[in-house]
């Protein structure tokens, strides 16, 4: 039986530097990933159920399977992205001795060094994502560029902060060459409590283990 997913609803509006029009367009694009993921899961399930995986249709099955990684990751990464934004805008950089700031200091030497690295990755040429991951076995943070949605994901690492840097995330508000301005706007809208929950959830799981 094929797995089915429902598009989530996100209560986001009045962000700083990211228009509601951009958000509405982005939500619709996300819903498209959900629909395509469901379609692919259904088609793949039919191939398996009918025993057609090793037959002459194998090339088609292979392409469906490869495509699933693109659509599914596109769906999930957008959910992480929307979840780490705060309606009405955030407060900028985290203040005080937060769990994330402490993790950034332990992993990079300081929060500012971590941020400079993350922003630098977000400015890289290409289409994809900048993601801060936590290594669950070490508790260390690291920043990575993900091409499209799936190439470069670090197996076993947990996404803690996810930034979409596809042009669709900002093209209505900024020119392609102005991606740094979008990144600045992104940081002014981060919901650090959501980021903390991701980090603390992993920490709690490690302690419980």
Where are these regions (language model features)?
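Feature for soluble, non-membrane regions of globular proteins
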Residues: 1-209
């Amino acid at each position: 039986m094929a797995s089915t997913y429902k598009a989530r609803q996100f209560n986001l509006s009045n962000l700083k530097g990211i228009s509601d029009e951009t958000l509405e367009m982005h939500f619709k694009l996300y819903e498209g990933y959900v629909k395509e993921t469901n379609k692919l899961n259904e088609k793949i399930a039919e191939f398996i159920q009918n025993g057609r995986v090793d037959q002459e249709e194998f090339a088609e099955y292979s392409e469906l399977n490869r495509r699933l990684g693109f659509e599914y990751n596109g769906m999930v990464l957008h959910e992480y992205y929307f979840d780490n934004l705060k309606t009405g805008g955030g407060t900028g950089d985290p203040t005080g001795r937060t769990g994330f700031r402490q993790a950034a200091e332990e992993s990079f030497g300081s929060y500012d060094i971590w941020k400079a690295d993350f922003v630098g990755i977000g400015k890289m040429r290409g289409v994809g994502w900048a993601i801060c991951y936590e290594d669950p076995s070490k508790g260390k943070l690291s920043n990575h560029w993900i091409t499209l949605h799936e190439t470069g994901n670090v197996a076993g690492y947990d996404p803690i902060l996810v930034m979409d840097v596809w042009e669709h995330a900002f093209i209505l508000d900024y020119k392609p060459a102005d991606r740094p301005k979008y990144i600045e706007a992104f940081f002014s809208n981060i919901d650090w409590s959501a980021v903390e929950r991701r980090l603390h959830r992993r920490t709690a799981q490690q302690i419980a283990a």
